[in-house]
Amino acid sequence: RISNIQDGLVSLDNCVYIEGDIDKRFIISNGDLLIAMSGATTGKMGVYQYDCPALLNQRVGNIKVNTSLLLQKYRDYFMQSQGDLILKLSYGGAQPNVSAKIISDLFIPIPSLNEQEKIVAEIEKWFGFIDEIENGKIELESHIKKTKSKILDLAISGKLVPQDPNDEPAIELLKRINPDFEPCDNSHYENIEFDIPQNWVWATIGDIFEHNTGKALNASNPNGTMLDYITTSNLYWDRFELSVIKQMPFTESEIERCIVRKGDLLICEGGDVGRAAIWDYDYNIMIQNHIHRLRGKVDICTRYFFYLFMHYKLHNLIGGKGVAIQGLSSRDLHNLIIPVPSLKEQYDIASSIDLYFSKLDMITAEL
């Protein structure tokens, strides 16, 4: 059946077995090329590579080969080259359908068997090169992903940019927010396995940010002004997808709690827990309840903290076995312990990561 044709071969998984007389016209032999004649996968082909005979389903064509004229592999590569033409010639309604006549009327150039062998060898040589390139591409993409992770590791442990002893210690930044601030102790978080520079400090998200979540959708409460809002389906890593925006009513008190302004850091509460992006648009928007809004209590480099969330996500420190449980509640987020460098170093780190990531993204785009 068509479902047995997979990845250029024929699989015997989930075959239907019958008993009774066999019409020789429908016998499939080792080396036959089968083609889907109808349906969504019209033109799909696979070589039958078993010694046991099989029977042909009515929606599957069988292209046998006269070995005195054609090599099996030459036939296979020729038919692959005709795939687009076969689809173009197909007819039918909602789904394409290929007749036996379309297949039998295809013109095929037939060189000598010796020349066919050379053609097949040349094709397979170039296919081998292509496979090497594809495998190299996959390997390079893996290296790029690991490199990005390593860059974040270095950044969050204070090893990406040089330490400047003249920088204001991070604790002074925290004391401007709260004169009674005391650094946190990260020792009871077993997954945080790195030390930070002497002029950095361990703090919580609640020490640095004003934190709110959005409004839960409630169709039974129509009070308020209809305003645009975004959900987690609009929020992706470092970007927003705004092609579909919904509206719901917000009261005056809800507007202040749920409004997002340029520069706010937004975090997913559920789904891909911890997924984050900075709202960088010149207009405001509202958020639904499954998004956390973080707004710095003083001047901070929000992009540094965005990359911090990316690092924590990669190391399962949010939404995993570490700092938080599955689903990032307001309490979990408020108490999340983070490394805080000086303000200047926050900007230096974020700029360096932006630069390195942009170069790696350029390489990825060229693959």
What is each model feature region?
Residues 1-2, 19-79, 92, 99, ...:
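A short beta-sheet element
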Residues 12-14, 89-92, 162-168, 185-190, ...:
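Short coil/turn segments at secondary-structure boundaries
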Residues 105, 109, 113, 117, ...:
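Non-catalytic DNA-recognition/assembly elements of restriction-modification systems
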Residues 139-189:
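Extended, domain-scale alpha-helical bundle/helix-rich regions
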